[in-house]
Amino acid sequence: MPADIPKSVVQKLVFFTAAMIICPVATFFICQYLFSNNAIISGGVSALVANIVLIGYVVAAFMEDTTEQEPEETKKSR
């Protein structure tokens, strides 16, 4: 029996998964170029960017509306 997972949840997960992979790697190589091959600075900034993406995901998950609409009461269910 498949679970009823909203499409917006899957889209958000895919977006943040891609961001978690692409942003730190891109940041590392951009910092390598800008700071003349200093791996310590590049790695630190890359770790900072990974943490920012992770915090963004947590905030987005908490702000998501997950309340389900309760079925209306009928005379039989009372």
Curated annotation (Swiss-Prot):
Which GO terms are recorded in the biological process aspect for this UniProt protein? Answer: vacuolar proton-transporting V-type ATPase complex assembly
Q: Where is this motif: Prevents secretion from ER?
A: 75-78
Membrane-traversing stretches:
15-35, 39-59
Task: Show which residues sit on the Cytoplasmic side of the membrane.
Answer: 1-14, 60-78
Membrane topology according to the record: Multi-pass membrane protein
Show which residues sit on the Lumenal side of the membrane. 36-38
Keywords attached to this entry? Cytoplasmic vesicle, Endoplasmic reticulum, Membrane, Transmembrane, Transmembrane helix
Top-level division of the source organism's lineage: Eukaryota
| GO CC terms of this entry | endoplasmic reticulum membrane; endoplasmic reticulum-Golgi intermediate compartment membrane; ER to Golgi transport vesicle membrane
Subcellular location, in the record's words? Endoplasmic reticulum membrane; Endoplasmic reticulum-Golgi intermediate compartment membrane; Cytoplasmic vesicle, COPII-coated vesicle membrane
Q: Which Pfam families match?
A: VMA21
| Chief localisation class | endoplasmic reticulum
Q: Which family does it belong to?
A: Belongs to the VMA21 family.
What is the purpose of this protein?
A: Required for the assembly of the V0 complex of the vacuolar ATPase (V-ATPase) in the endoplasmic reticulum.
Protein's recorded name: Vacuolar ATPase assembly integral membrane protein VMA21
What lineage does the source organism belong to? Eukaryota, Fungi, Dikarya, Ascomycota, Saccharomycotina
